[in-house]
Curated annotation (Swiss-Prot):
InterPro entries reported for this sequence: Eisosome1 (IPR024527)
Domain of life: Eukaryota
CC per GO annotation: plasma membrane
Compartments it resides in: Cytoplasmic granule; Cell membrane
Compositionally biased tracts (Basic and acidic residues): 781-797
Low complexity composition-biased segments: 752-764
Bias kind Polar residues: ranges: 127-142, 163-176, 798-810
Assigned protein family: Belongs to the EIS1 family.
Membrane topology, as annotated: Peripheral membrane protein
Name assigned to this protein: Eisosome protein 1
Coiled-coil parts of chain: none
UniProt keyword annotations, A-Z: Acetylation, Cell membrane, Membrane, Phosphoprotein
GO biological process per UniProt: eisosome assembly
Length: 843
């Protein structure tokens, strides 16, 4: 089979565009159909394959190499290939693996960075022969395994191993053979423009690099403005000679070097050495000075070296005079002196009449000429590389010879592969014929088996149908006899059913009449029982309802009394606060009066005033004491009244709570009796179970009714008793008030006229309540203990009578409230005040 085919250049672009989604047979049929239907519009390309497929790129590549037409990887024939430089190498590998499907030539599973990585690694390993695996007659499984081993990493290692060192290229050109990847790697290293992919991905912009480049560019522009470069205005090839124009300027140093017959390069070297040594010396001096200063700072108490101190002083003066006018004048003087020296020296006479200088100039010109002719007859390859034509031919032969060697090797491998394919096809056809004969025998045997089984099934079907028909006839006859027997039995049962229905209807009528009569009698009896039970229930529940009403009324009265007591308590608290305020005012007046008495005593001793003026002052003191005693008496009575009312309010609250619990208990007992009565009436009993009632309540229902009747009588008589008690209390109060007024009028001993006026004013300010009048009269009337005892007993009687009138049922003894009264202590304090007044009178 020949690899030669006349494929035109316009058909190259359509190679590799067929789809490889299925097997080889599907691709063949689809290509045939597409060729048949598209024969009118498209020109059928010339092919060498019998299946109608297009030529592969590998076949076209080998054909072009054979006829001297080299297809470079740098060309843009990248249909279905991600990297154009790896196309030829991948095609050769696929042809070596004997991949016969169209899908293999898409080259979608190669890493485009393989050759790039190989070219960047650089040439280190050199091979004499290309990597070509020997073809052998193996099965398709070994080929697939070998294909799976081919990976981008292996391709990179191959490409890396194929590279060669450029330094040893001239000596090893004839004895080495290289693969196709060497050419692609060289091309990829030479020009980066060919490495573009079919669909390049957009790269992200690195702003840091952009900013760094902008800064560098700005710095370079500023430097160019400040230090402009001298341009070369001569035509021709641009060289770097214009940059060295200032190298041989006629300075004093240059002229001294010329006169001393020293070469310019050596002079420059000497100058550089001197400069470096001066810098080193200055740096060492700087370090020494820094060390000395550090030692000075570490030990401030020690003496400093005079030289160091002198240098430091000079440095300070120098720093202070950097911007002074003296420094500027010295600099200007130095510049003027240097200009005068330059003007006085005749450089032209020294330059053009000196033979040694001319010889040195000729030597320099010759050396520069040799430097210029260094790259004569050489080609600039770019990047500062100049090569001779001989070197270029050697490099080109070294690059092309391995390619041609590998092409010849691949051609031999292809011929061996064609022979192996022919042998395989022959063996496959032979096995296919054997398989077809086996299939024919299987089909004939299957037909025979089908006919025999069909005949057997027919015979079995006939015998089974006959058996089923006989059994069905016997079953029908047997069922007919059973049906006749059941029909006779059905007629007998129907006649019996009619007679039974008539009998049952008659019995139902009789039973219904009897039940109606019994229901009427039972309804009348139930109505009588209900009326009797209601009457009995009303009689039993009447005392409970009465108790409940009485308890609620009593609770209401107690609540009203509690509200009144609370109002009285608040009023008394306000009065107590007022009295305390007045007492504090009287105390302040007493203190002022005492101070005044002391002053008056002093004046009396000094001036000897009369007794009348002294008595008048003492009478004022007595009036104030009387007012204070009066307010204290009112305060004590109101405090006693307040505490008594608080006790009464607490008692009323407890009693109201007790009444509430009793009401709840009576309600519960009433509900219990009602429930027991309902249970007894539901059971049909005439009376309640008295034993159970006694266990629950503690007495029988009759006893409970009699007890509640006596309580009702007591509750009815309670208002009349309370009225009588209140009338008796009022009479007692009037008698006590009359007796107190007599005692206050007859038994009171007047202290002075001012004391009488105080008692009259105190009696005029008394409140309407009789208790307050009596207490005030007792405390303001005199010095005797009998009056105080009477007032205390009177307050006790009032509290006892009030409790008897308000709460008749309260059992609190009057002796339990004695500790709340503070009249005795106040009376004693009044006596002490009066004794003090009498002592002053005696003085």
């Amino acid at each position: 089979m020949s690899l030669i085919s006349a494929v035109e250049d316009r058909d190259i672009h359509n190679i590799g565009k067929t789809s490889g989604g299925g097997s080889r047979t599907s691709s063949i049929t689809s290509s045939k159909k597409s060729l048949k239907h598209g024969s009118k519009s498209l020109r059928k390309p010339k092919v060498y394959q019998t299946t109608g497929e297009l030529l592969s790129r590998e076949a076209l590549y080998k054909a072009k190499l054979k006829y001297g037409v080299y297809q470079s990887p740098a060309q843009s024939y990248s249909i279905g290939v991600s990297d154009a430089h790896a196309a030829s190498d991948k095609a050769a590998n696929l042809a070596h693996d004997n991949q016969t499907t169209v899908e293999a030539y898409k080259r979608m599973f190669i890493d485009p960075n393989a050759t790039k990585a190989a070219s960047k690694m650089g040439p280190k390993v050199v091979r004499n022969n290309s990597i070509t695996s020997a073809t052998s007659k193996t099965s398709x499984e070994s080929q697939t395994k070998r294909k799976s081993k081919e990976s981008p990493g292996a391709a990179a290692s191959k490409a890396y191993s194929m590279t060669m060192e450029t330094t040893s290229l001239s000596s090893q050109t004839n004895s080495r053979s290289y693969s196709i990847t060497s050419a692609s790697s060289v091309l990829s290293g030479a020009s980066g423009s060919f490495n573009s992919t079919v669909n390049p991905k957009p790269k992200t912009l690195n702003l840091e690099k952009v900013l760094v480049g902008a800064e560098k560019k700005a710095e370079s522009r500023i430097k160019e403005r400040w230090e402009p470069e001298k341009t070369n205005f001569q035509y021709g090839v641009k060289t770097d000679e214009h940059g060295n124009l200032n190298q041989f300027s006629f300075s004093n140093e240059m002229m001294n070097n010329i006169m001393a017959k020293v070469d310019a390069p050596k002079a420059q070297d000497l100058q550089k050495v001197k400069k470096v040594s001066a810098e080193k010396e200055a740096k060492s001096m700087k370090f020494a000075l820094g060390a000395a200063n550090a030692v000075k700072d570490m030990h401030p108490g020690e003496d400093i070296d005079k030289s160091i101190a002198l240098k430091a002083q000079k440095r300070e003066t120098y720093l202070s005079q950097l911007t002074s006018q003296q420094v500027l004048t010295l600099a200007r003087a130095n510049v003027d002196r240097q200009l005068d020296i330059i003007e006085k020296s005749d450089m032209h006479r020294k330059l053009f009449t000196n033979m040694e200088y001319n010889k040195a100039a000729v030597a320099v010109a010759q050396s520069n000429h040799q430097k210029k002719t260094e790259f004569h007859n050489k080609i600039n390859m770019g990047g500062g590389l100049f090569l001779s034509p001989e070197d270029i031919t050697k490099i080109a032969s070294g690059l092309i010879s391995p390619v041609l060697g590998e092409v010849s090797e691949r051609a031999e491998a292809q011929r061996a592969m064609d022979e192996e394919i022919a042998e395989r096809t022959e063996a496959y056809n032979k096995s296919l014929n054997e398989w077809e004969t086996m299939e024919r025998s299987i089909i004939s045997n299957d037909a025979k088996v089908l006919t025999t089984t069909a005949n057997r099934h027919q015979t079995e079907k006939k015998t089974s149908q006959e058996k089923i028909k006989a059994s069905f006839d016997a079953l029908v006859a047997r069922m007919d006899t059973k049906v006749a027997e059941r029909e006779t039995l059905l007629e007998d049962t129907k006649s019996k059913e009619i007679e039974f229905k008539k009998q049952m209807q008659q019995e139902l009528k009789d039973e219904k009449a009897r039940l109606d009569q019994d229901l009427e009698e039972w309804g009348k009896k139930c109505e009588q029982d209900i009326t009797e039970a209601r009457k009995e229930q009303e009689e039993l529940l009447k005392p409970y309802h009465d108790d409940l009403a009485n308890a609620e009324a009593e609770h209401k009265t107690l609540v009203e009394e509690r509200d009144x007591i609370n109002a009285e308590i608040s009023r008394l608290q306000d009065a107590i606060v007022d009295h305390k305020r007045k007492i504090s005012g009287y105390g302040n007046d007493l203190d002022a009066q005492k101070n005044r008495n002391i002053r008056e005593d002093d004046k009396l001793l000094e001036l000897g005033q009369t007794k009348e003026s002294l008595e008048s002052h003492l009478n004022d003191d007595v009036i104030i004491l009387a007012n204070k005693a009066k307010e204290q008496a009112e305060l004590s009575t109101k405090e006693a009244r307040l505490k008594q009312l608080e006790v009464d309010s607490l008692i009323n609250e407890r009693k109201s709570e007790l009444n509430a619990t009793x009401i709840e208990l009576k309600k519960e007992k009433l509900x219990l009796l009602e429930a027991m009565k309902d249970v007894a009436s539901a059971r049909g009993d005439d009376k309640i179970d008295e034993e159970k009632v006694k266990k629950l309540i503690g007495m029988t229902s009759e006893e409970y009714l009699t007890q509640n009747k006596s309580v009702e009588k007591n509750v009815e008589d309670l208002p009349t008793q309370l009225e009588x008690i209140e009338e008796g209390d009022e009479l007692k109060k009037e008698e006590i008030v009359g007796a107190e007024t007599k005692n206050s009028g007859g038994d009171g001993v007047p202290v002075s006229t001012a004391a009488k006026e105080a008692t009259e004013t105190s009696s005029a300010v008394q409140t309407k309540e009789p208790e307050e009048k009596i207490s005030i009269g007792n405390k303001s009337s005199g010095k005797e203990d009998a009056n105080d005892c009477k007032s205390a007993e009177h307050s006790k009687e009032i509290s006892v009578s009030q409790k008897a009138g308000n709460n008749k049922s309260l059992g609190v003894s009057p002796d339990s409230l004695e500790h709340t009264f503070s009249g005795f202590s106040q009376g004693s304090s009044i006596e002490d005040d009066q004794d003090a007044i009498s002592n002053q009178e005696k003085k």
